[in-house]
Amino acid sequence: MAVMAPRTLVLLLSGALALTQTWAGSHSMRYFSTSVSRPGRGEPRFIAVGYVDDTQFVRFDSDAASQRMEPRAPWIEQEGPEYWDEETRSVKASAQTDRVDLGTLRGYYNQSEDGSHTIQLMFGCDVGSDGRFLRGYRQDAYDGKDYIALNEDLRSWTAADMAAQITQRKWEAAHAAEQLRAYLEGTCVEWLRRYLENGKETLQRTDPPKTHMTHHPISDREATLRCWALGFYPAEITLTWQRDGEDQTQDTELVETRPAGDGTFQKWAAVVVPSGEEQRYTCHVQHEGLPKPLTLRWEPSSQPTIPIVGIIAGLVLLGAVITGAVVAAVMWRRKSSDRKGGSYSQAASSDSAQGSDVSLTACKV
C-alpha cells in the first residue's frame, strides 16, 4: 500500500468536508488545451486553460516567459509551491505528447509537413449539489474536427473516422478508458470539491442580470427590438421572445453568452417586428440570480430609440480577444450538456502528488 503524502491527506480531508456541504445546482471542472504546429518556426505552440464552472483559474502558454502554469483566480493562489510544480510538470508533459501526436496524425491523414495543424483536447467532471460525481467526459479534435471521444459510460470510445479508429484500438489495448475513469470519478471530483470550497465567495455566488430593451428602426415598416442581459453570473441564462404570449424561437436572433471581462457575462436576443406592433412583443429572462423570471416590454416613453453600435462592437471585440487567448478551444467545446465529452490523458494510479490536471499527460494517438 502506498504511503499517503501530506498533500493527498489534505485533499481527502477537504473532500470529506465537502460531502457534508451542499451547493446550488451542479458544478464542473474542465481543462482545455490546444497545440498548433508552426512548420519552419520552431516547436508547436501549446496553450492550456482550466475552468471551474465559468471561471478560468489556471493557464499555461508555451510562448510565455515564465514557462509555468499560472493562476488566473485569487482563490487558487493559496496553493503551495508543490501544487504549481506538479501542474507545470503535467502540462509540459502534455505539450510534449502533443508534439509527437501532431506528427503521428499527419501520417494518419497523409498530410505534408508544410501546413499548420491543430490538436484540441477537453476533459473534466461534473458534481451535483451534494458534491457527488455526476458525469465525466473527454473529447479530442484534429484540425477543428471531432477525432475521438469518451462515451458517457466512461468505458468505451467513439471514433470519428478511420484514422481515429487506429487510436481507438491503441487505447482499448492499453485500457485507457479504465485509467481515465478512475481519474474522472476520483481525483477530478476531489479537486473540484476543494476548489468550490476555497473559492466559494466567487464560484458559488449569483449575480442577477441587469436588463433593458433597445429599439432600432430598420425602415418605416420594421424595427429591431433587442433584449439585453448584462453583468450576470453564472453564465447559464435564458432569453426568449414572445408575441401575444407565443414563443418566437424561429424568428429570434440570439448571440452566444459572452464574458464581460470582469467575471460576469453578457447576452442579448433580438427580434424584428412590424413598426407600431412593438407592444405585442415581450422578452422573458430566466437566471439563477433572479427570484422569479423577468418580463420586459418596450416602453417608448421611458426608453430612447438609440443605436448602441458601440456596445455591440465592444462585445464582438471582447469575444474575439477571448477566443484568441485560448486558440479557439472554447469554440470547439460542445454547446449541449448532453453531448459532453472530455480529453483523455493517463491518470496516475498511485502518484500521491498528482494535481487536478494529472490527465493532461495524454496517451499517444
UniProtKB/Swiss-Prot annotation:
The chain crosses the membrane at residues 309-332. It is a single-pass type I membrane protein. Residues 338-365 are annotated as: Disordered. The modification Phosphotyrosine is found at residue 344. It holds the Pfam family C1-set. GO terms for biological process: antigen processing and presentation of peptide antigen via MHC class I; immune response. Residues 299-308 are annotated as: Connecting peptide. It is found in: Membrane. CDD domains: IgC1_MHC_Ia_HLA-B (cd21026). GO terms for cellular component: cell surface; early endosome membrane; ER to Golgi transport vesicle membrane; lumenal side of endoplasmic reticulum membrane; MHC class I protein complex; phagocytic vesicle membrane; recycling endosome membrane. PANTHER family: HLA CLASS I HISTOCOMPATIBILITY ANTIGEN, A ALPHA CHAIN (PTHR16675:SF229), MHC CLASS I-RELATED (PTHR16675). Belongs to the MHC class I family. This is Patr class I histocompatibility antigen, A-126 alpha chain. It comes from Pan troglodytes. The lineage of its organism: Eukaryota, Metazoa, Chordata, Craniata, Vertebrata.
